[in-house]
Design a protein with these regions (language model features):
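Structured alpha/beta or helical-core interaction and ligand-binding surfaces enriched in interleaved
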Residues: 1-160
């Protein structure tokens, strides 16, 4: 039996709060695959330390794919939060204000200003809130529908 799906979508800030959509659904449905990740959890054991932001990064599409696959295997109690970015050199160009916004975003799991940074060229900000609850910011909100429809809604109408 399929569990119910709950979705709250804010199209002003392009954020989706959902229950019943899992990390594996997110990972399977992505069209714009992240090249690099900046981990917003300072206690994360994954990634390499980046000294300009004092956060950890996962570099390269292969390492990111492995992280995303492992992310779907984690238990609900593990704190996963990240923002993707395109160019590693631009991390070093972030201002103190931009870094403080990233720290706020990671700590409070909500945004002060736009969660989409010009220097990072990010498409996603991802928060696993536990208890099967996700908050994801999408640069292109249509990406959420590509995750929801094939992975969840179509599954409701097919027999296992």
């Amino acid at each position: 039996m399929n569990s119910p799906i709950f979705v709250h979508m804010d199209t002003t800030s392009n954020v989706v709060l959902s229950r019943g959509i899992q990390a594996k659904d997110f990972q399977r449905g992505l069209i714009h695959r992240p090249n690099n990740l900046l981990l917003l959890n300072p206690a994360s054991l994954d990634g390499e330390f980046e000294n300009h932001t004092n956060l950890k990064v996962i570099k390269g599409s292969f390492a990111v794919e492995q992280f995303l696959q492992n992310m779907s295997k984690r238990r609900n109690n593990q704190d996963v939060r990240w923002i993707d970015f395109t160019d590693l050199t631009m991390i070093k160009e972030l201002s103190a204000l931009e870094i403080s916004e990233l720290l706020y975003l990671g700590h409070m799991k909500t945004h002060l200003h736009s969660p989409f940074f010009y220097k990072l060229q990010n498409n996603f900000v991802y928060f696993d809130l536990g208890d099967d609850l996700l908050r994801v910011y999408y640069r292109y909100i249509e990406e959420f529908y590509r995750i929801l429809v094939p992975n969840k809604l179509l599954g409701l109408f097919t027999k296992n």
